[in-house]
Amino acid sequence: MSRICQITGKGPMVGNNVSHANNKTKRRFLPNLRTVRITLEDGTTRKVRVAASTLRTLKKQSSK
């Protein structure tokens, strides 16, 4: 399984670890993925891997 949000396509980013001596080494920032059940328009449910920020947006949109 890849570390990609199945709704927004948000994936890992690349950056640097920076030490106190300002030495830089590469690192990856991974999305905060959660597995949730989502009910589709036709009434069926599916398990999807969603970023936490996307889940927050979905909850906000569904409450309106």
Curated annotation (Swiss-Prot):
Q: What GO terms describe the biological role, i.e. biological process, of this protein?
A: translation
The UniProt entry's GO CC annotations, sorted and at most eight, read: ribonucleoprotein complex; ribosome
A Pfam family this protein belongs to?
Answer: Ribosomal_L28
The UniProt GO MF terms for this protein read:
structural constituent of ribosome
The question of whether Ribonucleoprotein is a record keyword is answered with yes
Keyword annotations from UniProtKB, A to Z: Ribonucleoprotein, Ribosomal protein
Keyword Ribosomal protein in record: yes
**Which PANTHER family does this chain map to?**
50S RIBOSOMAL PROTEIN L28, LARGE RIBOSOMAL SUBUNIT PROTEIN BL28A
The record's comment on protein family reads:
Belongs to the bacterial ribosomal protein bL28 family.
How is this protein named in the record? Large ribosomal subunit protein bL28
Source organism: Campylobacter lari (strain RM2100 / D67 / ATCC BAA-1060)
